[in-house]
Amino acid sequence: GYPQPATQRPAAAPMSGARTRYWIEINGTRHQISRATLVLGRSTDADVRIDDPGVSRRHCEIRTGTPSTIQDLGSTNGIVVDGQHTTRATLRDGSRIVVGSTTVIYRQAEG
């Protein structure tokens, strides 16, 4: 009674039709990311507005994909991702992004 490995579907195979969902959490508020790119900043033009004097008008951009990345858009104070001061980083589920004095949590999930 040994299982036949050839007949088992690999556990890592994504379910058909499952899409990865992306969102960020700022101060407990969830912001769905529905486009390929999301600009965070203090400006009303930003996709997600962060009302923080340490945040530039167009501070940084999150680009979803495999992998998702974040890019500093020439902000005054830069970005810190998972404790590293950087201009560009790869994001994973649970990444902590600090812009100004605001912490943004990046989240992604299948389906």
Model-derived regions, located:
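Forkhead-associated
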Residues: 29-108
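Short polybasic amphipathic segments
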Residues: 20-24, 77-79
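A short, polar/charged loop/turn motif at coil->beta-strand junctions and beta-hairpin connectors
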Residues: 18-20, 27, 34
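Low-complexity, Pro/Ser/Thr/Gly/Ala-rich intrinsically disordered linkers and tails that serve as
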Residues: 1-22, 111
